[in-house]
Regions:
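Divalent metal-dependent catalytic cores for phosphoryl transfer on phosphate-bearing substrates
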Residues: 5-120
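Low-complexity, glycine/alanine/valine/leucine- and proline-rich hydrophobic stretches
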Residues: 110-147
Length: 147
């Protein structure tokens, strides 16, 4: 995700980078939950977890990034009580990370070695495109196209 955030021209503090990395590690925490409830259950698990070295805004960022990954980024009703605990900057980054994970997880099927082969590229007019190598083109289908 470091290369992706660079492609998006998003600057990060060391703490934000650490939280982004942690969110990537936690994003599949609710894998056993029913898909209709996975986002909410993951959000609740992370929001109420006892992490060391994570402040309240950081915990909310982690929870929201995972919720946005499962529920979509255009839903403003996700945990309104929690969104008030984070800055607009954290909320924006949670949405971006959640959106990125939402697309990439469909392409990787959570299998190791696939994600490093994908990359985001900035094109004319500021358009961002996900570049999929020819060897992985069969992973691209209707669901990733819709996201």
């Amino acid at each position: 995700t470091t290369r992706t955030f660079a492609a998006f021209d998003l600057d990060e503090t060391e703490e934000e980078r650490r939280y982004r990395h942690a969110a990537c590690l936690l994003t599949d925490i609710g894998w056993r939950a029913h898909p209709e409830y996975r986002g909410t259950q993951s959000l609740n698990i992370i929001a109420h977890a006892s992490f060391i070295g994570v402040d309240h805004p950081g915990r909310v960022f982690l929870a929201l990034a995972t919720a946005f990954r499962h529920e979509g980024v255009f839903i403003d009703t996700i945990a309104p009580a929690l969104t008030g605990l984070v800055s607009d900057r954290y909320l924006e980054r949670a949405r971006i990370l959640g959106a990125m994970l939402r697309v990439v997880y469909l392409l990787t099927a959570s299998m190791p070695g696939v994600m490093p082969r994908l990359r985001w590229e900035k094109r004319a007019g500021g358009v961002l495109a996900l570049v999929i190598p020819a060897a992985l083109v069969n992973l691209y289908g209707e669901r990733p196209a819709g996201r």
